[in-house]
Regions:
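Active-site cores that bind ATP or allylic diphosphates and position pyrophosphate for catalysis
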Residues: 1-378
Length: 378
């Protein structure tokens, strides 16, 4: 979830002891409103809780009830804690529903909530997200994008990650929706597709991205089809309910629909309901595959994957000020971490090795265990 993701990232940065600012993108681009909303959601004042309970009793989903409760709560001027009641906060907080309906705003609020809960000294700042919406599935080509009356500037046709993935799975068709064919393979991009991608991805990143595509090193969620089928075959309602994000209702739904579940993406479509969103189902199925039952409240270590030579001083500062163990070699981890830390690291290594194994099965390359991978130094 956005809440767990944000808490994990923020607790890691806070534990390093050298981070003084957290910058993230959001649709609103205004930190004051995001901080104000975060404060209410963390403190949960009595008036807000009563409003939330009332809207939930009317049958609204939790996100909808939360939006309505916050909208009503901020109709009272006394409930503003910020200093800009007549400035930035007022117009933005009058659009609570719009703010809470956009994914990057939601994640930004969760970052602010995590900072508050940790009593962190890190200061949050935000920049306005440019380009198409987070869930947009089309990638307009350069010429058509620049002439479109719906696009106001050159940055309006920056594609979303969802759209880029859709384009890769439908090569040569930058305007098609994501394929519904569960067996649709990821093919190497043709010239037209590659040109569209190159206009949407920074040059250095595009080089790495295209190299991976050309060599077949690109996985989709349906790469997990067989593994998911195996995992679900050996579960029952009680055991499924023990996995993170799997409620008893979802567990029963999985068992009842098991004969209809084919691929990963098709299973998500079959299982989702009004209350159980697509992203919730995706997370739940991944947790079943990866055998994840609980989320840590904080990340108890930091693992260095790589660094630039000119930034080596920063690494020295982290080693000096970090409040959590810093791991550069997996072989040293067992002696540096407690039981919880070793469990989390074990889950991380397993996930990485599974991904590596799937790539090897697809491309035929030699398997490289996570512990054998070298630190990247640029």
């Amino acid at each position: 979830s956005a809440e767990a993701f944000a808490m994990g990232g923020v607790s890691l940065l806070d534990g390093l002891g050298v981070v003084d600012m957290l910058c993230f993108g959001s649709e609103s681009g205004e930190i004051s409103a995001l901080k104000e909303l975060a404060e209410i959601l963390v403190e949960e004042p009595e008036e807000y809780k009563k409003l939330l309970k009332s809207f939930l009793s009317e049958g609204l989903t939790f996100p909808a009830a939360r939006s309505q409760a916050l909208t009503e709560y901020f109709k009272n001027p006394r409930n503003f804690s910020g200093d800009d009641f007549d400035g930035v906060l007022t117009p933005l907080l009058n659009e609570v529903t719009q703010i809470l309906n956009t994914p990057n705003n939601i994640l930004g609020i969760e970052y602010c909530k995590a900072l508050l809960r940790l009593n962190s000294q890190i200061r949050p700042v935000t920049i306005r997200r440019e380009g198409m919406g987070y869930h947009e599935t089309t990638v307009p080509e350069g010429d058509s994008a620049s002439s479109s009356p719906d696009l106001q500037s050159s940055t309006d046709f920056f594609a979303s990650a969802t759209a880029i993935r859709s384009l890769i799975q439908n090569p040569g068709d930058g305007h098609s929706e994501a394929s519904s064919d569960i067996n649709n393979p990821v093919r190497n991009p043709d010239t037209k597709t590659a040109n569209i991608l190159s206009s949407q991805i920074p040059p250095d990143a595009f080089y790495v991205f295209k190299k991976a595509l050309d060599s077949g090193e690109f996985l989709t969620e349906n790469s997990l089809d067989s593994i998911l089928s195996y995992c679900l075959m050996k579960e029952n309602v009680e055991s499924l309910s023990s996995y993170m994000d799997v409620s008893e209702d979802l567990a029963r739904r999985i068992i009842n629909q098991q004969n209809l579940l084919l691929s990963f993406s098709q299973s998500v479509s079959v299982l989702k309901t009004r209350e159980l969103t697509q992203t919730r189902i995706q997370r739940a199925l991944l947790h079943i595959i990866l055998n994840i039952h609980t989320a840590p409240t904080q990340i108890p270590f930091a693992r260095v994957l790589g660094f630039r030579r000119e930034s080596s001083e920063l690494l020295s500062q982290i080693k000096q000020h970090s409040q959590i163990p810093l791991i550069t070699k997996l072989a040293d981890a067992q002696n540096l971490l407690d039981s919880e830390g070793n469990q989390i690291l074990s889950e991380t290594v397993f996930s990485s090795n599974l991904y590596e194994k799937l790539l090897c099965l697809k491309t035929g390359r030699k398997f490289c265990h996570e512990s054998q991978k070298q630190l990247i130094i640029l």
